[in-house]
């Protein structure tokens, strides 16, 4: 099993030339950062599109959120949103090139992106075998609700969540020290931004992967 993340930037045609260059540079930066921390392969295409393949699928969900929150918060002068579709399943990477690779995970990821609303993220479970019940309806509801929460973050809130997830969910006191504030303040800000929802969602999706 592999995981394939396909996505594109939201409303990139409305960006100025300078903002578009910043967005693409930022997208490449965060993907290189993710590649440095995982065993993924990525490719940029269609001007504002991207695809990432994770041979180790348990790395995929956290990377998906890391990418999203980086674009929301770490590009100077502009907050960029993206639409994402992450699918699990069989697949074969062709010469380290996601764009020319094939398999269930690639097909399902592409289809899910085509059916996603702008700014939404979707996760597609691998085909269920051995008579087990698919959890896809529950996953769809959770993705819809969490997309709603994340799409309403301010740039400051997204920045805090980016710090939280990119540092592998450190203790709140660590973030407090880094931001020169109190632990209580960080805890309240994380909760109001939906930070307490990320790790349970990641763990849930990875548990389903192990059951497929």
Regions found by a protein language model. Give the residues of each.
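Regulatory and interdomain segments flanking nucleotide-handling catalytic cores
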Residues: 1-212
């Amino acid at each position: 099993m592999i995981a394939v993340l396909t996505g594109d930037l939201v409303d990139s045609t409305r960006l100025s030339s300078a903002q578009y260059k910043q967005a693409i540079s930022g997208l490449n930066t965060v993907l290189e950062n993710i590649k440095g921390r995982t065993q993924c392969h990525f490719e940029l295409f269609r001007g504002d599109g991207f695809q990432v393949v994770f041979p180790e699928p348990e790395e995929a969900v956290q990377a998906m959120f890391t990418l999203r929150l980086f674009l929301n918060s770490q590009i100077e002068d502009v907050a960029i949103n993206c639409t994402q579709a992450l699918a699990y399943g069989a697949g074969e990477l062709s010469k380290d090139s996601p764009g020319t690779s094939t398999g269930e995970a690639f097909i399902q990821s592409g289809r899910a992106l085509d059916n996603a609303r702008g700014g939404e993220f979707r996760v597609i479970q691998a085909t269920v075998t051995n008579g087990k019940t698919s959890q896809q309806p529950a996953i769809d509801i959770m993705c819809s609700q969490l997309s709603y929460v994340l799409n309403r973050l301010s740039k400051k809130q997204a920045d805090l969540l980016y710090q939280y997830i990119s540092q592998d969910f450190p203790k709140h006191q660590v973030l407090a020290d880094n931001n020169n504030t109190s632990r209580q303040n960080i805890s309240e800000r994380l909760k109001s931004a939906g930070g307490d929802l990320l790790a349970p969602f990641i763990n849930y999706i990875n548990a389903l992967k192990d059951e497929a």
